[in-house]
Amino acid sequence: HASTASRVHEMLKMRFFDILIASIFLIIACPFFIILSILIWTSGSKPFFKHKRVGLNGKEFYCLKFTSMKGLNEIEEAEQERVIFELDHFGKVNNDPRVTKIGNFIRKTSIDETPQFFNVLKGDMSLIGPRPITKAEMKIYGTKIKSYLSVKPGITGLWQISGRSNTTYSRRVAIDHYYALKRTRRMKIMIMMKTVYVVLFMKGAQ
């Protein structure tokens, strides 16, 4: 019972921290969000898009991002075929022709993911946790999916600071599993500190 009470206490403290940091960030970033939204709008895209992801206990939610790509039908036909092939076979696209000029910048700097602070405020995500996955990706996790579903997905996390795009998917699953089992306060502080370095120097971003 003592360990359960301690775990609940830790969760409440983390929730308070999430709300505090997300609120401060969104207030400060509001003017920047407006400017970036206008720039994306003038490039011919809607500023935001949402995609369904799986979170704590298997609950689905809409994860927010700034739009960084064109639609598939907006690129050349030959490139469309390449994109479809690489997505089907590798799960990602090298030198993706759908990425816009401004999209390339906001992806490299991870700015495209900053609207997820709204997800944190809502309670679907935490500041720290595994990267949110789709329902289709759940099968890749195998038996380790239980550990993924035991925590809230995060804006940053152990995998996100461990190379991100430079790591394999199986490595990502292993890292998410390890974090879910451990997730000590010391580990969370280390993740927050290293996140600043990773974002500033664009390590592992695509």
Task: Give residue ranges: language-model regions.
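C-terminal terminal-structure detector
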Residues: 3-12, 144-206
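A hydrophobic, helix-centered structural microdomain
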Residues: 5-74, 185-206
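Generic recognition of short, well-ordered alpha-helical interface segments
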Residues: 15, 46, 61, 94-100, ...
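Residue-level signal for short amphipathic helical patches enriched in basic/charged
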Residues: 30, 109-112, 128, 164, ...
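Short, glycine-rich, amphipathic interfacial segments at transmembrane boundaries or analogous
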Residues: 49-97, 156-174
